[in-house]
Amino acid sequence: MSKMRVEVVSTEQLIFSGEAEFVVAPATEGEIGVYPQHVPLLTRIKPGVLRLKVPGTKEEVLVAVSGGMMEVQPSLITVLADTAIRGEDLDEARANEAKRAAEDALKHATDDMSTAKAHAALAVAIAELKTLDYLKKRAH
């Protein structure tokens, strides 16, 4: 099968650098699947699960992303994420607590700015929990 180079970078560090047979990303208009030789494009990504299919295996690398940009070239995909955490590095208890705190902040938000921050934090926590759910399903 054909493959492409994929680079996933957060503001803090390089998260993934390697080859993939395909990539599924949470674009703002819906999930987008990208195979090698895809037509070039630039898209915003929203909080969600980035899935990278590792060549020659059934393995997928899962990354929780909080948003950012994805550039697609025929043989290279670059994801510039605001924050990104590999699935195996996520902490379920911390993600659940972050979700609870964001929901609480949303209930007590008094202005547009605090409401927007709470919505953003909630979206990130949900993306992390969704990534953990993918990992659990894959283990079965």
Curated annotation (Swiss-Prot):
SUPFAM superfamilies: Epsilon subunit of F1F0-ATP synthase C-terminal domain (SSF46604), Epsilon subunit of F1F0-ATP synthase N-terminal domain (SSF51344)
Cell membrane listed as a keyword: yes
Record-given protein name: ATP synthase epsilon chain
GO MF terms held by the record: ATP binding; proton-transporting ATP synthase activity, rotational mechanism
Subcellular location field: Cell inner membrane
Membrane topology: Peripheral membrane protein
Record keywords: ATP synthesis, Cell inner membrane, Cell membrane, CF(1), Hydrogen ion transport, Ion transport, Membrane, Transport
PANTHER family to which the protein is assigned, alphabetical: ATP SYNTHASE DELTA/EPSILON CHAIN, ATP SYNTHASE EPSILON CHAIN, CHLOROPLASTIC
Family: Belongs to the ATPase epsilon chain family.
Coiled-coil portions: none
Subunit structure: F-type ATPases have 2 components, CF(1) - the catalytic core - and CF(0) - the membrane proton channel. CF(1) has five subunits: alpha(3), beta(3), gamma(1), delta(1), epsilon(1). CF(0) has three main subunits: a, b and c.
Lineage: Bacteria, Pseudomonadati, Pseudomonadota, Betaproteobacteria, Neisseriales
Domain of life of the source: Bacteria
Role according to the record: Produces ATP from ADP in the presence of a proton gradient across the membrane.
One GO term describing the cellular component: proton-transporting ATP synthase complex
Cross-referenced HAMAP family: ATP_synth_epsil_bac
Intrachain S-S bonds: none
